[in-house]
């Protein structure tokens, strides 16, 4: 019982659960129960962002199993922050990832509900309008595109997008705090004049490791730790393992006892839903858990979102055998060549095809080549496929 998912209780400024209760209860009857049985009673945004932003010291965070401290001079925050805020502005996230984040009621954007619809392409670029939305210390500006409204808490805890709000509250100078960051060609996050090729090419970046106080010019940066291994991965690893089991498996323990592990839909539901409920989203039922293929795809989705910008997807795509499809798909994002008076053009999904964004993956890339010096020492060794 040493490790568990980190969560923080609901506060006065926490966002309420989705209001389409009847619709969600058909998906997850326990959703409106208190956490961990359901998703009620916790602050989903803070429960996610406090783990990475430095708000909660790693020594008292029960989710961190292994971690390492990140240097403030060379960290995801520096890579993501705009040049004008002391960063490099070159950490790009792709449109595929953005579109994978669900709506606040757990529906995919292409299957959104009537209560929380994903806007049509003819209007998705328009401003949300009205007053700025504030919840859990996060500010969603009224100038934000409608396509980013009513998305799941992990979206706001992870993704920096055009018209994102960067508080930088520790700054001693107003010019570096409370900044509306835009990625238009004439926007706030435009390129460093000394390095014109070093700019954000997709209009999306990672804010997972950003604290509200962080400001690198005239302020301070919170100490942060990178999650080498955290309890959320233990849970999803276990769910994936028992989903793939075809027959019971018995382990001999050091004390002479035996432990038998088998395909268990109740465990799949219990531990998968811990992750979903912490994120403020509906879980699954045992009826869904009984479908191995369905659960496999759900796990792939959940790992992509839960561990975004944590270095897990590199290995996941390879062990699943999905890397060729994923990496040979063109990179796309916003049209960052558009100016601020060309809003619709900016938000039109654009394929990137220059020397810095082209990528390819062939079968041989699943393996490393065996060095020639090693092959020369042992004539019985055979080089890995396609490495000649």
Where in the sequence are the language-model features?
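Segments forming glycine/polar-rich beta-alpha architectures that bind adenosine-containing cofactors
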Residues: 66-154, 160, 165
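C-terminal substrate/ligand-recognition segments
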Residues: 128-275
């Amino acid at each position: 019982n040493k490790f568990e998912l980190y969560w923080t209780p609901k506060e006065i400024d926490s966002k309420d659960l989705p209001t389409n209760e009847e619709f969600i209860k058909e998906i997850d009857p326990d959703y409106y129960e208190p956490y961990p049985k359901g998703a009620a009673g916790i602050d989903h945004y803070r429960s996610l962002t406090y783990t990475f932003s430095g708000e909660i010291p790693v020594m008292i965070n029960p989710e961190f199993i292994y971690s390492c401290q990140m240097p403030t001079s060379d960290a995801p925050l520096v890579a993501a922050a705009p040049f004008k805020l002391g960063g490099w502005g070159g950490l790009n996230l792709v449109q595929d990832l953005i579109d994978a984040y669900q709506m606040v009621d757990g529906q995919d954007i292409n299957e959104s509900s009537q209560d929380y619809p994903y806007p049509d392409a003819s209007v998705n670029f328009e401003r949300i309008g009205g007053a700025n939305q504030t919840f859990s210390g996060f500010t969603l500006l009224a100038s934000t595109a409608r396509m980013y409204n009513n998305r799941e808490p992990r979206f706001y805890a992870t993704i920096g997008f055009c018209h994102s709000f960067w508080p930088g509250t520790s700054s001693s100078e107003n010019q570096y705090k409370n900044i509306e960051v835009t990625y238009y060609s004439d926007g706030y996050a435009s390129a460093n004049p000394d390095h014109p090729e070093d700019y954000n090419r997709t209009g999306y970046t990672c804010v997972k490791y950003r604290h509200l106080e962080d400001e690198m010019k005239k302020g301070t940066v919170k100490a942060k730790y990178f999650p080498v291994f955290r309890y959320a991965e233990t849970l999803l690893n276990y769910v994936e393992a028992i989903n793939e089991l075809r027959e019971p498996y018995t382990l001999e323990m050091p004390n002479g006892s035996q432990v038998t592990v088998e395909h268990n839909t109740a465990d799949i539901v219990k531990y998968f839903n811990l992750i979903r409920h912490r994120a403020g989203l509906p879980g699954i039922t045992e009826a869904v858990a009984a479908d191995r293929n369905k659960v496999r795809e759900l796990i792939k989705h959940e790992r992509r979102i839960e561990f975004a910008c944590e270095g897990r997807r590199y290995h996941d795509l390879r062990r699943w055998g999905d890397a060729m499809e994923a990496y040979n798909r063109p990179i796309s994002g916003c049209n960052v060549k558009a100016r601020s008076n060309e809003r619709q053009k900016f938000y039109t999904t654009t394929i990137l095809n220059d020397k810095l964004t082209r990528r390819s993956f062939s079968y041989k890339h699943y393996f490393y080549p065996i060095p020639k010096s090693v092959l020369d020492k042992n004539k019985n060794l055979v080089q890995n496929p396609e490495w000649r």
